[in-house]
Amino acid sequence: MTDEIPFDKPIRDIASYVHNYTIPSSPTSFKHARGVILDSLGCAIETLHRSSEACTLLGPVIPGTTFPYGFHLPGTSYVLDPVKGTFDLGVLIRYLDHNDAFGGAEWGHPSDTLSAIIAVMDWLCRAEQRSSTTSIRYPPLTIKTLLEAAIKAYEIQGCYQLQNAFNAYGIDHVILVKLAAASVCSWLMGMTETQTISGANTTSRKGWAAADAAMRAVHLCLLTHAGQLGSKQPLNDKRYGFLVHTFGLEAGFALPRAFGDWAIQNIFTKLMPCEGHGISAVEAALVQGRKLKSCGHTVSDIKHIDLRVTAAANLIISKIGRLYNAADRDHCIQYVIALAFLKGRFPDAEDYMDDSPYANSKEMDDLREKIMMKVDQDLTQGYLDPERKSCGTGMTVYLNNGTVLDEVLVEYPAGHLKNPRTKELHQRKFEKNMRLAFTDAEIANIVKCIEDDEMPISSFVDLFTRDSKGMAKL
């Protein structure tokens, strides 16, 4: 009887895309994919060396245990099962809020899915090398497949983010990490399209929520691989369906384009550890700060600051009152603006920590209170337009003596593909992060190897092995 009930169409569409779509041979998407993979691994190395807090989450659940042929966690000597390995790499990529971002009605970070993809591929590759009896037909476990998996995961998450505001229903955006990672990892594990439909059928905190979602995606794939079936209509069921109680059964999800390779070509690279909607505001503040200094004034001379922002920025990162921790601070537009004025340069992860001189600064608190925000419809429209995908902020500064520093408008901050500085700064970011643990020769070799489509994933991951940096407390 249940065999006659079709799976929900969005689930069928995702499975068909993952299994049947061929990425165009144009090098653009693959070039971007190589870039986001290196950027994400660079972010992982940065976290290892800058966040002792994140390192407490790393390593086997039971200290001292090992997993045969497991995933080698980059930057450490840990060898982990694919589920814990996905979580740990997800923590390292995401924790300092320095990994890439993608905007729309929902904001998210498609690179979160790479933790699942890399962990699963490395584990399968090492297991395959030690067994000649497996009957499962995996796709080739090479750099080329890694690139294809990344492009498809980015596309699934990116397309769903454009016009579907999960946050409006109190749902964490990492649900899309689970969706994209489960879909792609089921293909990597050699499952059929029908099995993928079960694997992608899922129903989800700042530093580790995406890691948890990616980990759950791998776990769901393993359950499906073992024969568990997914529900066929979690979206459309008349009583309990997700769409019935959220976006509406008739409206459904809004997908303005078919799945292809668009998202990977429109990703926003994070060149500073700061919630993405605040980056253009930081750049505007740096410009205004230089103007302020050039005319002989200081921050204490500011009467108030007027901001024109997108609706998304106002909703997600406008905060008044006390900020309780680092995650609270790097997700506060008033904090990052004040920080830019006080510091005079891009923020660093350390600027958000409890022991930072800015975290308990009266000057910081006073300046935050002087920032007035107004949602601007034109900036919001540009942000939501899939052809423009701007992330704009307009900033006007008023001084106590009546002087007005004319508005500085930043629509395409560094990190946006339309900003000519992005490519160079992206490369600098990667090299800076990697130098925390690797020599220039090793970094050059890693960059060379990402261009080798036929290289086994395990060989690539081996390039990142280092002594353990985790400090497990469990």
From Swiss-Prot:
Stored Gene3D superfamilies: 2-methylcitrate dehydratase PrpD
Free-text biotechnology note from the record: Phomoidrides A and B (also known as CP-225,917 and CP-263,114) are potent inhibitors of Ras farnesyltransferase and squalene synthase. CP-225,917 and CP-263,114 inhibit Ras farnesyl transferase from rat brain with IC(50) values of 6 uM and 20 uoM, respectively. CP-225,917 inhibits squalene synthase with an IC(50) value of 43 uM and CP-263,114 with an IC(50) of 160 uM.
Catalytic activity entry: (4E,11E)-2-hydroxytrideca-4,11-dien-1,2,3-tricarboxylate + 2 H(+) = [4-(deca-1,8-diyl)-2,5-dioxo-2,5-dihydro-3-furanyl]acetate + 2 H2O
InterPro entries tied to this protein: MmgE/PrpD_sf, MmgE/PrpD_sf_1, MmgE_PrpD, MmgE_PrpD_C, MmgE_PrpD_N
Record-listed E.C. numbers: 4.2.1.-
Disulfide bonds: none
Keyword Cell inner membrane attached: no
Family the entry assigns: Belongs to the PrpD family.
Purpose of the protein: Alkylcitrate dehydratasee; part of the gene cluster that mediates the biosynthesis of the antihypercholesterolemic agents phomoidrides which are dimeric anhydrides. Within the pathway, the alkylcitrate synthase (ACS) tstiJ and the alkylcitrate dehydratase (ACDH) tstI produce the decarboxylated monomeric anhydrides by coupling the C12-fatty acyl product from phiA with oxalacetic acid. The pathway begins with the highly reducing polyketide synthase tstA that catalyzes the formation of a C12-fatty acyl-ACP, starting from one acetate and 5 malonate units.
Subunit structure: Monomer.
Protein's name according to its UniProt entry: Alkylcitrate dehydratase phiI
Source organism (scientific name): Talaromyces stipitatus (strain ATCC 10500 / CBS 375.48 / QM 6759 / NRRL 1006) (Penicillium stipitatum)
